[in-house]
Amino acid sequence: MDKIIKSIAQSGSFRAYVLDSTETVALAQEKHNTLSSSTVALGRTLIANQILAANQKGDSRITVKVIGDSSFGHIISVADTKGHVKGYIQNTGVDIKKTATGEVLVGPFMGNGHFVTIIDYGTGNPYTSTTPLITGEIGEDFAYYLTESEQTPSAIGLNVLLDENDKVKVAGGFMVQVLPGASEEEVARYEKRLQEMPAISHLLASKNHVDALLEAIYGDEPYKRLSEEPLSFQCDCSRERFEAALMTLPKADLQAMIDEDKGAEIVCQFCGTKYQFNESDLEAIINDKA
């Protein structure tokens, strides 16, 4: 089961979140049938949103949009504070690797664009923030958002490793944030440790990558685990929700579906589930509108 572990240094000078998001990203790949680069880009966005959602309280709903002008198009993710996340990528078929190493490429195919977050607190006044894409690698773009928009300097690591068949092998990440009151000496020490950390891809390849991440972040610094919470890819779409959407259409459009297509098929963008509405279903909706 996927999870996020929240921890804090014994000194109270900084905190860290580490995540195992393997099942989340694997299910997203299965739902959308994504190829290598698209899988990694979508996976990193889902992990970023899992971190962002874990930072919220109450019943907030968090939307992350990575909007580029190159091959991937838009990547959209929605998460809640209960550990659920869903998402999709416009172009599922990007599959580009370095010839020499086989490394999956992401940044060069994101292009210029923006990292957009929408936090809906359920009050009717969602908070929206937009920051530019810095590298298109998503992790750096997320860190820039946290620094610029939330005024919280953060170190972020996100990645998805694929097997020889380009299926998700492991996915996860971390966030480290300095807390108010940390001394300059403590900040310098943590910055040095982060600079010396192995690459996130190397840590994820460890047998127990969650423990490997924590060990790399804290070293011999005492820390305590605050909580361990489950994470999952879960879509909240339903037939009732799409039926309500059909109710908003003009009668003429619904009648055209009956006359021309003998019904309607609606596919959820986030999970690919198909919902069929036959002629009788559409006629009932038309009658309900009357």
From Swiss-Prot:
A single Gene Ontology CC term: cytoplasm
Disulfide bonds: C235-C237, C268-C271
Pfam families, per the entry: HSP33 (PF01430)
GO biological-process terms attached to the record: protein refolding
Single annotated GO MF: unfolded protein binding
Major subcellular location class: cytoplasm
Subcellular location(s) per record: Cytoplasm
Statement: the UniProt record of this protein carries the keyword Metal-binding: no
UniProtKB keywords: Chaperone, Cytoplasm, Disulfide bond, Redox-active center, Zinc
InterPro entries for the chain: Heat_shock_Hsp33 (IPR000397), Heat_shock_Hsp33_C (IPR016154), Heat_shock_Hsp33_N (IPR016153)
PTM summary: Under oxidizing conditions two disulfide bonds are formed involving the reactive cysteines. Under reducing conditions zinc is bound to the reactive cysteines and the protein is inactive.
CDD domains: Hsp33 (cd00498)
Database matches in HAMAP family: HslO
Function: Redox regulated molecular chaperone. Protects both thermally unfolding and oxidatively damaged proteins from irreversible aggregation. Plays an important role in the bacterial defense system toward oxidative stress.
Family statement: Belongs to the HSP33 family.
Protein name as it appears in the record: 33 kDa chaperonin
Annotated source species: Streptococcus pyogenes serotype M12 (strain MGAS2096)
